[in-house]
Amino acid sequence: MGQNQFRWSNEQLREHVEIIDGTRSPHKLLKNATYLNSYIREWMQANIWIYDDRIIYVGEKLPEQLHECEVIDCDGKYVVPSYIEPHAHPYQLYNPETLANHAMQFGTTTFINDNLTLFFTLKREESFHLLDEFTKIPASMYWWCRFDGQTELQNGESLFNSEEIIKWLQHEAVLQGGELTAWPKLLHGDDEMLTWVQETKRLQKKVEGHFPGASEATLAKLKLLGTDCDHEAMTGQEALARLMQGYTVSLRNSSIRPDLEVLLKELLELGVKQFDRFIFTTDGSHPSFYENGMTNIMIATAIKKGIPVIDAYQMASYNIARYYNMEHIHGAIATGRIANINILESKENPVPTSVIAKGQWVKRDGVNTHEALHIDWSKCKVTPLSLEWSIEKEDMLFSNKTGIHLLNNVITKPYTSEINIDCDELSIDYDECFLMMIARDGTWRVNTVVKGFAKEIGGLASSYSGTGDIILVGKRKEDMLTAFHRIKELGGGMVIAEKNEVLHEIALPLLGIMSELKMSELIQKEKKMVNLLQERGYVYNDPAFTILFFSATHLPFIRVTFIGLYDVKSGKVVASPVNLIKQY
């Protein structure tokens, strides 16, 4: 086996030993640190030696050689393992690098990421090149492999085939299969998917569920089929039910499911005292949700709700690393681990004043010391969206009165419109809008109506969607066209238009899905978009999720997909797609 297949080469390992022998200097020394020992579950005093990206020693001794060493006096400070996000969807307007850069400022340095966007938009070789590029940034980036597209796909079987899935599962940076948004297929006889689950287990990797509202019997069956963890519990009782069936339970706090306070309160009321099978996730929230951090907020919430302080930190670090079989390099401050370390002012405040990621300062005494971006997206075939087609007014005909009634950010039900939709502009007296999904390649469209999205919006166009297709929604067809033409000019984005002029835009030049902006700038743009939509009658809090999930057939009850307007419960097509007037 070649040296490059190991994390550290033989030569590097010899250098690490030389530091213990006193013949080589470490690069950093955290002196007099009060640190969380994840194994003894105690706060202990120690000196922590770091060389390059590795913890070399933790204990009472000081290095003999200090000529190349930066000494940091940690007296009065508290040192904990940096936090891990085990369930990231790193394409929610931000991109994986800008998300990581932002989250590292709040102590989260390790991410286990969804591969779905890469799977949809890049060839496998291009995706794997990108995964290799991500090893070069200070954050530790890992991935999961989807088994389905969480919507009805035109080319679903060709995309999700055994050759592709197995190659992804075999990649060393891929730690799990799932999430299993198509679990009913698995449960009802899809043996190809079951084989992928089996292969995941054979590779000693994990399988992540997606089981909202699942009964005890369903949870038991899916555990028998190979699932290890689920993040969809919405009550303490649901979390306990998963624990009782042998799952690791991922407690979620996201922009559309901010459930953590309820989950913790109810688990404590149910008498739960042992938390080593619980972990935290924010489940791919949109930018503004992360304005004040990521995992740090969940730790603070847990402490506030009465979870023992050490358990709160363990659920954000050690428990996750142990679950994913990477405890030998992550999740603890101990000899041999990657140097991902947070320095805190107090145990009760999980926002670090300083953060070390892979042995590098990314935050020092409250100052961001890592703002540089390293990923050259164009070299990875991640480029602006090129729409070599257009739509005509004649494409914007609406006759089918069966539509989508939005009940919250993402849940829908079918409804029948009772207003006149054979017009160029809908009345603001009703909360109904035109809705179009148009194929990314311009070959087809689905026209319908949506109730409950907004009352006074002119037009919104978005290349950000669950399938990468184009979404248009609005009261006024001219404004919908104005917004559409602007996303073409931008190479992708989300655009609001009013009175034939662009009111607000978020450029998404990376595949039409992701921004290149720093997270702080993107947060302000998203907040403005939300405010503008709420002023125009959007009554929920996350319109980007609403748009993303218009096509999501893993959620009830009616969705717009490439096969048409689709009734999820019956599996029937309510209205079929049609070709655009002009074919390009």
From Swiss-Prot:
<protein>
    <recommendedName>
        <fullName>Putative adenine deaminase BA_3032/GBAA_3032/BAS2818</fullName>
        <ecNumber>3.5.4.2</ecNumber>
    </recommendedName>
</protein>
<dbReference type="InterPro" id="IPR032466">
    <property type="entry name" value="Metal_Hydrolase"/>
</dbReference>
<dbReference type="Pfam" id="PF01979">
    <property type="entry name" value="Amidohydro_1"/>
</dbReference>
<dbReference type="InterPro" id="IPR026912">
    <property type="entry name" value="Adenine_deam_C"/>
</dbReference>
<comment type="similarity">
    <text>Belongs to the metallo-dependent hydrolases superfamily. Adenine deaminase family.</text>
</comment>
<dbReference type="InterPro" id="IPR006680">
    <property type="entry name" value="Amidohydro-rel"/>
</dbReference>
<dbReference type="GO" id="GO:0000034">
    <property type="term" value="F:adenine deaminase activity"/>
</dbReference>
<dbReference type="Pfam" id="PF13382">
    <property type="entry name" value="Adenine_deam_C"/>
</dbReference>
<keyword id="KW-0378">Hydrolase</keyword>
<dbReference type="InterPro" id="IPR011059">
    <property type="entry name" value="Metal-dep_hydrolase_composite"/>
</dbReference>
